[in-house]
Amino acid sequence: MARERIRVKLCGFDVELVDQSSRAIVHAVQKAGAEVLGPIPLPTRMHKFTVLRSPHVNKKSREQFEMRTHKRLIDIIEPSQEVMNALMGLELSAGVDVRIKQ
């Protein structure tokens, strides 16, 4: 018999915001009385971009930029209506993308 669970996935560019949001979600869910697994850190995705410093000369002179995407996974085991209300009432940072799957 499979246990019902909700999977919350957090993504963001700032690791502190992602961790702060994951702590807020875990605290709210535990306060509502559900079992929580996580936050589980997922691999950080790094995108590197190399561009020319000058628009028309100095081909060897280049600049590199990096964009890191941090991810966390939280599983909520057998959620109740109180847990769902607690999740919907949370105010999270604008820099964190939250995806909820059932």
Curated annotation (Swiss-Prot):
This is Small ribosomal subunit protein uS10. GO terms for molecular function: structural constituent of ribosome; tRNA binding. One of its GO terms (biological process) is translation. The gene is rpsJ. The keyword Transmembrane helix does not apply. Keywords: Ribonucleoprotein, Ribosomal protein. Belongs to the universal ribosomal protein uS10 family. It holds the Pfam family Ribosomal_S10. InterPro entries: Ribosomal_uS10 (IPR001848), Ribosomal_uS10_CS (IPR018268), Ribosomal_uS10_dom (IPR027486), Ribosomal_uS10_dom_sf (IPR036838). One of its GO terms (cellular component) is ribonucleoprotein complex. Transmembrane segments: none annotated. It comes from Treponema pallidum (strain Nichols).
